[in-house]
Amino acid sequence: MALAKELMGYPLITERSSLVSSASHFKKRTQSTQFSINPFDRRPRKTKSGVVAAISEDLVKTLRFSTTTGDRKSEEEEKAAVKFKVRAVVTVRNKNKEDLKETLVKHLDAFADKIGRNIVLELISTQLDPKTKLPKKSNAAVLKDWSKKSKTKAERVHYTAEFTVDAAFGSPGAITVMNKHQKEFFLESITIEGFALGPVHFPCNSWVQSQKDHPDKRIFFTNQPYLPNETPSGLRVLREKELKNLRGDGSGVRKLSDRIYDFDVYNDLGNPDKSSELSRPKLGGKEVPYPRRCRTGRQSTVSDKDAESRVEKPLPMYVPRDEQFEESKQDTFAAGRLKAVLHHLIPSLKASIVAEDFADFGEIDRLYKEGLLLKLGFQDDIFKKFPLPKVVVDTLQESTKGLLKYDTPKILSKDKNAWLRDDEFARQAIAGINPVNIERVKTFPPVSNLDPKIYGPQHSALTDDHIIGHLDGFSVQQALEENRLYMLDYHDIFLPFLDRINALDGRKAYATRTIFFLTRLGTLKPVAIELSLPPHGPKHRSKRVLTPPVDATSNWMWQLAKAHVSSNDAGVHQLVNHWLRTHACLEPFILAAHRQLSAMHPIFKLLDPHMRYTLEINALARQSLISADGVIEGGFTAGAYGMEMSAAAYKSSWRFDMEGLPADLIRRGMAIPDATQPHGLKLLIEDYPYANDGLLLWSAIQTWVRTYVERYYPNPNLIKTDSELQSWYSESINVGHADLRDADWWPELSTVDDLVSILTTLIWLASAQHAALNFGQYPYGGYVPNRPPLMRRLIPDESDPEYASFISHPEKYYFSSMPSLAQTSKFMAVVDTLSTHSPDEEYIGERQQPSIWTGDAEIVEAFYGFAAEIGRIEKEIEKRNADPDRRNRCGAGVLPYELLVPSSEPGVTCRGVPNSVSI
């Protein structure tokens, strides 16, 4: 019961104290408020009346010092003469699983605690001592009963400590913690009871390292937000000291226990010491512009002084200690990795026994029905051919019960053949996993922006004749004027890399353009696909155009062309829209926030849940996903040139001012400004599920952010003079995005509107934009023919030697163009992991410790209003998915669009909008 009251904001101590001359020594707040909210009830609540000093007899020892000279003491001296005790309730989160070493150290710490090597806390006032000019402090207090509770198995353990303070202490503003044990511990929160203003909350959520690793005391501040110029005098030095600790000095190799945030270039993706073929260019700098990543300080490689040495799995990559995954997240990710390893191992073994290519669609289907080992009944052959250790055999055989059996991707759930249809191919451009590339055709034929001296004529090979027969009676000009022509244009991003890509073993690609027509029903249909290769001489056929089929041969050609488009789309989705725009480009803002914004700063408190786990997942990506010979290189068409392609997109097209949803829709020609419409935009494709749902979330985020910002910045001068805020934004641009710092499109930060726009964009990218691009990867891409991540053969024409074999066995040629069994299984396992919500996911409209994350009751109330709006949006999306007039999300065999539904259960659900880029 006591714990429940503590979580609700009630004092733990209810007995009134009998203080000597309490009226003259304590000024009680008669109008103070203490916000009390059930974390599981999002209904707006009224604030309750204030809690006065609640100090029980057993905790209060009033020591009135009598005057010996008869002189009257000052009021300050009289207050200082009155001592009383207050209590801290300290919540520590236990690990669910410990290895042998951790268990031994835990027992040693329990013993050491008995003999005086304790956890020591010290309370610090918001006021300065008038004599010493230093912050007022309590006595040092020891955390009680650590040894006694060391065997407690509960997830959370509550300890207490007692402080002695005087009546002149003022309000608590900070608390220091010294860990004299050998083992770190996770400090979740501290609540102080006994002051007249009511309970004082310290939301900590941090690992506290042993004194032997980090000799300095840890500093935690209350949940009361302060702008820099409002910082109480007793906290100013501590505020700057804590920021200095987090910045470090830019030198040295980082230890896993460090809390230092700093910048570096992407020079750790290659492994030149292992092989020259694994050398990769440095990303970041004048030659190859790129955002900055978290600095680790590792030594350079032997063979390349500009390259940082690698940390290979299972060794962890450095991120600041509090950025590392929590235990349940680690377990979810580790399970996914095991599945990926086993899924990759079996096809690799199988490749030497049976053919590597799929024979037909049924063979792919059996991956979901039977699993890998059972699929062709070849498990006995593998175990005979490869004398594996018994433990490996047992593991593999046990795994066939589920781990090696793939879940059926959602794309097959309603109509397993829907993906073959042209209307579904087109629908996924606006309601699939990559709905952010489609653009309105403004000029036909399309025109390239590449240098014609290098890449040939800028005009497309597309002509009116190619598409006129598919425009439902419209002329091309009429279709343009009525906004009925749309396009996926991957010409300029792929063409500069094609010679190198097509020289790779088992990789073949085109630079594609796909033209869509918007029908009178509001659905899209593809009307032409242009396939381009780099020109190699005047007689070389570098461009060809395919149109919807008219016979069996053209049907197979058309299916192959759509597969090449989907492969282009998958590469740009992963390397540019997903990795670059929502992972890499956010990292500098996160690093700068920790370095420049105090935990007391209201903007840090706003951004905090939207930064969770991002540095860790980005570090893991550098280790195994985007690294040389990593998952992205092995699984996607661009291969070793994928990250260079990502860097080219950053240089040529990334603009922070265009990353917000409304600006992005306008830039792509998918919407026009219209003040009479909801959200101030008119969508030119009315049934555009990603944009329809995204605008609901964008507006909700924007309204919440505006309410928050206006609370702390009632006039623009406060923004201009906020040193921490300006330093954060400046460092994000000038250091984190240093290669683009001179661009004229960076928004200014001078007004409330400026700040609202910047923060809304960041929160949108971290939450809804990332969710729309990430959590459908397995549901849509887990069936590889729907979205092949790479292609292995070009499409033959009549002059090619392969044309005869294509005509004879088109299905065989089709599957030989697709990824192999080994490539497919590895890719499926990886995107399955990346599409998975962990049990500790925090979704938009949710926060840890929802009623105490800030001490501002008005803002807590506003946050619950925001959460209620998110709930209304979820119901609206469900309503839209049941509306038969919305043909792009409702109909026979049509998947509902749920990627922006805010909530989700754990697992692969194809829905859910987490607060942050956490996977």
From Swiss-Prot:
InterPro entries hit by this protein: LipOase, LipOase_C, LipOase_C_sf, LipOase_CS, LipOase_Fe_BS, LipOase_plant, Lipoxy_PLAT/LH2, Lipoxygenase_dom_3
Enzyme class: oxidoreductase
GO molecular function: linoleate 13S-lipoxygenase activity; metal ion binding
Induction section of the entry: Induced by methyl jasmonate (MeJA), bacterial pathogens (e.g. Pseudomonas syringae pv. tomato), high light and wounding.
Regions that span the bilayer: none
Gene3D superfamilies, per database record: 3.10.450.60, Lipoxygenase-1, Domain 2, Lipoxygenase-1, Domain 3, Lipoxygenase-1, Domain 5, PLAT/LH2 domain
Pfam families the UniProt entry points to: Lipoxygenase, PLAT
Official protein name in the record: Lipoxygenase 3, chloroplastic
